[in-house]
Regions:
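N-terminal alpha-helical interaction blocks
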Residues: 1-50
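Sequence context surrounding c-type heme c attachment/ligation sites in exported
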Residues: 46-240
Length: 240
């Protein structure tokens, strides 16, 4: 992992920790062994302690989010493999606006890391109220009296609703919750989380706009051919 991040020029300080079982290596994820995410402007890297693969998502200007895995068990000749169906089951459907995209969710989580889907979830971007963010994520850093769902595990499912997080705020040390030595950084910074949520949403918007433009240009060219017009003649329907 350190060698890969160094090659990609991604800083370990970008580390985020998510403990909900909501990724392809869900059997490796729990509040004691969260999945780590690292990112820069265009690349996202997912790492599970003792996982079989490192997960990568790249924001491609033409295709949108493109997904890869790097086999961690083959240290002599590591190979990065393109992934399609496995990742696009979640990252290419309605939850990413119908285009290959990135998905950030906030939900209630049981002590073993399983999401409690019967209680619903929030799809998170920069417009989501702070009080609804970070369910299933660790959050470190100071934020005053503002409430959020980070660092919170539902231990009593019979507790009165709505469930709230009244104690796990302004956390600076995660060493009592997980073995921080297994990760490249000790925390899951609140500022990095907010940048991540904004950036993934913008990447999805850019992908959606690009797909719409490509579809419009394809429609325009075919309509012009049918009308005997130059293929690049603008149509009102593609200029809206």
């Amino acid at each position: 992992l350190p060698a890969l991040l160094q090659e990609l020029k991604i800083l370990p300080a970008s580390q985020l920790l998510v403990f909900s079982k909501t990724s392809m290596q869900r059997d490796r994820i729990s509040p004691r062994t969260p999945r780590a995410l690292y990112f820069d402007d265009d690349v996202y890297v997912g790492y599970c302690h003792a996982g079989e693969v490192i997960e990568l998502a790249v924001s491609d200007p033409q295709l949108g989010a493109v997904f890869y895995t790097l086999d961690q068990t083959n240290r002599e000749t590591p190979v990065i493999e393109r992934q399609t169906h496995t990742c696009l089951q979640c990252h290419g459907a309605t939850q990413s606006d119908g285009v290959p995209g990135l998905l950030v969710r906030s939900l209630f989580v049981a002590p073993n890391g399983l999401p409690i889907l019967s209680e619903g979830s929030y799809r998170v971007d920069h417009t989501t109220p702070i009080k609804d963010r970070w369910g299933g994520w660790y959050v470190t850093g100071s934020h005053g009296s503002q409430k959020h769902l980070g660092n919170f595990v539902v231990r009593d499912r019979s507790a009165p609703r709505p469930w709230g997080n009244d104690v796990d705020r302004n956390v600076s040390d995660l060493s009592d919750r997980l073995s921080t030595d297994n990760y490249l950084a000790p925390g899951s910074d609140i500022v990095a989380l907010m940048v991540f949520e904004h950036q993934t949403h913008v990447h999805n918007l850019l992908t959606k706009a690009n797909y719409a433009a490509q579809q419009a240009m394809y429609y325009q060219a075919n309509m012009n051919r049918a009308l005997g017009q130059p293929v690049d003649s603008p149509l009102d329907s593609t200029m809206r």
